């Protein structure tokens, strides 16, 4: 018998999902039959017609709470929340302004906390509970030059994942994915042209950058009954990690 994951009748919210990793995650849930809800600060022109879109700036706690309430009001339930909204431009650690640092922590840590709190509130009232998946980064578990505040926020997100998983069990499972380098439509801004992207990919044991949909595949598993005994986990999705420097010395 083939093993399949069917999300028919399930409602999944992916934050920051109009492009990049979030778009790939949302697509995989759609492929599995879920009712897909996405949010971002601005709508995208090319979203599938059957995806629901809500505009929200999740750095604002009240806006984040209102988003979750609106999704539940529109659909009657929320089964899976994927806290994907985040990111950081290169920022010099020694000269980053307080405003930049504050906004990076708001986006990469506090937004997920706000959404998770209100999602848990609703999921605890559902007979089937729910699942929360936090998209973290390998920057949380290794030095993060030029993205120090981002890495610190993601490290905090990993701790929040473990703590909330403990407190909200057994009704709600909470897991994180520490993603490595991913080939999004903006990969060239970080890694350069095709040759640069290939060179960076060659430093990974699997020889390439991840695709957004591959992070989506992990999310589909973590949100499903197949992961019913998985909570408080941090999945390293980094293609084997970056090769140690001594190998190229």
Listing of model-derived features with the role each one plays in the protein:
Residues 92-105, 196, 200:
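Substrate-binding pocket helix/loop in short-chain dehydrogenase/reductase
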Residues 137:
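Residue(s) in the substrate-gating loop at a strand-loop-helix junction
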Residues 121, 165-170, 228:
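Alpha-helical segment proximal to the catalytic Tyr-Lys
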Residues 11, 18-19:
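Conserved glycine-rich cofactor-binding loop
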Residues 176, 195-230, 235-239:
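C-terminal helical subdomain
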Residues 116, 153, 161:
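Active-site helix of classical SDR
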Residues 2, 142, 231-249:
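Short C-terminal tail/terminal secondary-structure segment
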């Amino acid at each position: 018998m083939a093993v399949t994951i069917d999300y028919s009748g399930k409602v999944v919210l992916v934050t920051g999902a109009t492009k990049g990793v979030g778009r790939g995650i949302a697509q995989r849930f759609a492929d599995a039959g879920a009712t897909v809800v996405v949010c971002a600060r601005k709508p995208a022109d090319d979203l599938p017609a059957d995806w629901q879109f809500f505009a929200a700036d999740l750095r604002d706690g009240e806006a984040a709470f209102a988003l979750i309430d609106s999704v539940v009001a529109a659909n009657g339930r929320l089964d899976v929340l994927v806290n994907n909204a985040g990111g950081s431009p290169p920022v010099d650690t020694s000269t980053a302004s307080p405003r930049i640092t504050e906004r990076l922590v708001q986006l990469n840590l506090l937004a997920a906390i706000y959404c998770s709190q209100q999602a848990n509130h609703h999921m605890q009232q559902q007979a089937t509970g729910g699942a929360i998946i936090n998209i973290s980064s390998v920057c949380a578990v290794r030095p993060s030059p030029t993205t120090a505040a981002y890495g610190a926020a993601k490290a905090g997100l990993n701790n929040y994942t473990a703590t909330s998983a403990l407190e909200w069990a057994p009704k709600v499972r909470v897991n994180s994915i520490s993603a490595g380098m991913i080939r999004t439509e903006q990969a060239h801004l970080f890694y350069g042209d095709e040759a640069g992207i290939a060179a960076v990919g060659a430093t990974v044991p699997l020889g390439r950058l991840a695709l957004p949909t591959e992070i989506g595949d992990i999310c589909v598993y973590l949100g499903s009954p197949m992961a019913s005994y998985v909570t408080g986990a941090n999945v390293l999705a980094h293609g084997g990690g970056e090769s140690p420097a001594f190998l190229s010395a």
